[in-house]
Amino acid sequence: MSTIEERVKKIIIEQLGVKEDDVKSAASFVDDLGADSLDTVELVMALEEEFDTEIPDEEAEKITTVQAAIDYILSHQE
């Protein structure tokens, strides 16, 4: 079983079409990984599906880096 961190990074790689080496914890989806607003919405949707959770819009807006996504999922797992 993959760790949450590995699963989040895999989704980011698939959704944004970036290299694994580029997906560092501090990487910003927009500034470092070239995501646009649609990419970030699709990324949040993919995270919701993978982890069977719902991320409210106000929370989704705060998820701007790889680590923020990992932290959110970790803190909202049952």
Curated annotation (Swiss-Prot):
The modification O-(pantetheine 4'-phosphoryl)serine is found at S37. Keywords: Cytoplasm, Fatty acid biosynthesis, Fatty acid metabolism, Lipid biosynthesis, Lipid metabolism, Phosphopantetheine, Phosphoprotein. InterPro entries: ACP (IPR003231), ACP-like_sf (IPR036736), PP-bd_ACP (IPR009081), Ppantetheine_attach_site (IPR006162). Pfam families: PP-binding. Its main location: cytoplasm. Residues 2-77 form the Carrier domain. GO terms for biological process: lipid A biosynthetic process. Carrier of the growing fatty acid chain in fatty acid biosynthesis. Belongs to the acyl carrier protein (ACP) family. This is Acyl carrier protein.
